[in-house]
């Protein structure tokens, strides 16, 4: 009887305990924290350079902040959505990127960083396994960092 219960426990437990999903969700927490740190750093540099209240108008006239010799386009002092993935030190084998366009098809309004192997989310997805960075939309506003992990 004890052996049978042991076998049942070993075969049934993985169905109730989602270690892999919890690990992926935890990794997304790290990605979100990295996004927050990177955008806070760029915002501090934007304030020093006086571009913290400037709006990104288009790809050719964006205000920029110099970061380690690279110009980073900013929207109201925070990284433009298309720039955020370049500021993160993430492995391309583990994570993918999807850009969501706003009302202007040329302008990216948010970026999704998703866990590879969990399906590529649509740009406007509301479920899956990803972190969405949305750039600020007005002076004084801050970017949004949304973790979606119901598909991990």
Predicted features and spans:
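N-terminal single-pass transmembrane signal-anchor helix
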Residues: 1-20
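Short, contiguous, well-ordered secondary-structure segments
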Residues: 1-3, 41, 141
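Periplasmic/extracellular, small/polar-rich flexible segments of pilin-like filament-forming proteins
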Residues: 47-152
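Membrane-proximal N-terminal amphipathic helix
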Residues: 23-52
């Amino acid at each position: 009887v004890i052996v049978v219960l042991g076998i049942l426990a070993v075969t049934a437990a993985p169905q109730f305990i989602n270690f892999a999903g919890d690990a992926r969700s935890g990794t997304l927490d790290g990605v979100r924290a990295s996004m927050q740190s990177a955008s806070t750093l760029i915002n501090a540099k934007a304030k020093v350079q006086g571009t913290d209240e400037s709006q990104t108008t288009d790809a050719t006239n964006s205000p920029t902040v110099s970061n380690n010799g690279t110009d980073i386009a900013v929207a109201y002092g925070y990284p433009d959505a298309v720039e955020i993935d370049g500021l993160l030190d993430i492995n391309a084998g583990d994570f993918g990127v999807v850009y969501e366009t706003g009302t202007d098809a040329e302008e990216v309004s948010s970026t999704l960083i998703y866990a590879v192997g969990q399906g590529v989310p649509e740009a406007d997805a509301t479920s899956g396994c990803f972190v969405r960075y949305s750039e600020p939309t007005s002076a004084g506003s801050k970017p949004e960092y949304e973790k979606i992990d119901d598909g991990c």
